[in-house]
Regions:
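Catalytic loop of short-chain dehydrogenase/reductase
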Residues: 35, 135-152, 171-229, 238-258
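Conserved glycine-rich Rossmann-like NAD(P)H-binding loop of the short-chain dehydrogenase/reductase
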Residues: 64-80
Length: 331
């Protein structure tokens, strides 16, 4: 009861709850860890693996027995991350070659996503987990090869298309789990289905990022509804404030001021790994999680979207990506 009260207090005060202190206080009350070998024989795909949370998640998933496909935009940086993780596994007596495989895909480029899915799906006829960790917070408005705003393309369009194209493999691997890395910043954002790329206002990278993170939370809920009978579960999560190269480059002042209090990458990856390795997301379909507990998707009423707006979002994403229900992996 005391632990529950402390958790609620940390959740609502935000500042301590998102720091390393909040993680340590909550972790002290958890009942045990993830059983060794929880993912033995299972295949998991992780995006955004070149550093930080993604790299930490890859290592932990591999240690739990998973065969982890590491998806990187930059093959050189991805190979360096694979070497770092592989070296740690080998030092622990785990054969890295049987646990890790590097893949190349640029989530911001829809052609790259389609090409990767077409190549990967036959190699993974049964897929048991996906962690969408790749993300970007641009300093200014930047365009992708298809002309879309970079944060929207990387954080939303790529994951939307890739997940739908891999649904056949996920269904074949059921019970399987898909986890999307969102952010506490999404609490400030309301879905704008009539302006998904925020073209009607002066560009602000943090605002664009928060909007994409709100969309990710909604997508987890929508997929959970659509796939409730298929054995594929969906969840989104907030990793907390984590000391990563991405945070340092995108929010340098925030990083500099709070660095002593930031979580390390392993703490940031914890909830994602826990969701992929346990049945928690199956018990709370589509929920938004932080530190192994479901959290409210909204803090204030004016960020809530209507059912019509959610439906419009799905249809717009399908139109923009060119994905249809009839495609392989569709319903």
């Amino acid at each position: 009861m005391i632990a529950s009260a402390l958790d609620r207090a940390l959740d609502w005060t935000v500042f301590p709850g998102y720091t390393s202190l909040g993680y340590r206080l909550r972790a002290a009350a958890w009942d045990g860890g993830i059983p060794p070998g929880a993912l033995a024989g299972r295949t998991v795909l992780v995006t955004g693996v070149s550093s930080g949370i993604g790299e930490a998640a890859v290592e932990r998933l591999a240690r739990l027995g998973a065969r982890v496909h590491m998806v990187a935009r930059d093959p050189e940086r991805g190979a360096t991350a694979l070497e770092r993780v592989g070296s740690k596994l080998e030092d622990s007596g785990i054969e890295a070659g049987s646990r890790l495989e590097l893949e190349r895909c640029d989530l911001s480029d829809l052609n790259s996503v389609r090409g990767f899915a077409a190549d990967f799906a036959p190699r993974a006829p049964q897929l048991h987990g996906v962690l969408h960790n790749a993300g970007v917070l641009p300093p200014g408005r930047r365009r992708t090869p298809q002309g879309h705003e970079l944060a929207f393309a990387t954080n939303v369009l790529g994951p939307f298309l890739l997940t739908n194209l891999l649904l056949s493999s996920l269904r074949a691997g059921a019970p399987s789990r898909v986890v999307l890395a969102s952010s506490g910043g999404m609490y400030t954002a309301r879905l704008r289905p009539d302006d998904l790329e925020l073209e009607r206002r002066e560009y602000d990278g943090a605002r664009a990022y928060a909007h994409t993170k709100r969309i990710e939370v909604i997508l987890a809920e929508l997929w959970a509804e659509r796939e409730r009978a298929s054995g594929v579960s969906f969840a989104s999560f907030h990793p907390g404030w984590v000391d990563t190269p991405g945070l340092e480059s995108s929010l340098p002042r925030f990083h500099r001021l709070l660095r002593p209090l930031l979580r390390d990458a392993d703490q940031g990856a914890d909830t994602a790994v826990w969701l992929l390795a346990t049945a928690a997301s199956e018990q709370r379909p589509g929920a938004f999680w932080h530190d192994r507990r479901p959290r409210p998707a909204h803090r204030v009423p004016w960020t809530r979207e209507s059912d019509a707006e959610r439906h419009r979002l799905w249809n717009e994403l399908a139109r923009i990506t060119g994905w249809s229900e009839e495609e392989k992996g569709g319903r």
